[in-house]
Amino acid sequence: MGDELIEVTEEQTLTREAAAARLRALADQLARHNQVEFVRDGLRYTAKVPAEVTLSVEVEIGDDGSEIEVEISW
C-alpha cells in the first residue's frame, strides 16, 4: 500500500452510555493489543500504536450545543 492514506470517519447517534462503551472498547484495544483494528470495504486494517502517543482533548461548550473531541496521534 505504500504511503496511501486510509481514513475512516464514522458518526452515529448513541446513548451516552453506549458512547462510553465504544470509548472503553477503543481504550482496551490500545492498552491490551497496542493496536486499533477497523474494517473498510470488507477489508480489515490494523493501525499499530507505539508505546508513546500524543493525546489531545478539546471541550467546547456553547448555547447551541457542546462537544468533546479526543485525538490520539503518533
What are these regions (language model features)?
Residues 1-16:
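Extended, compositionally biased eukaryotic interaction scaffolds
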Residues 53-74:
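C-terminal edge-of-domain segments
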Residues 10, 32-56:
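Short, structured protein-protein interaction patches enriched in aromatics and acidic/basic residues
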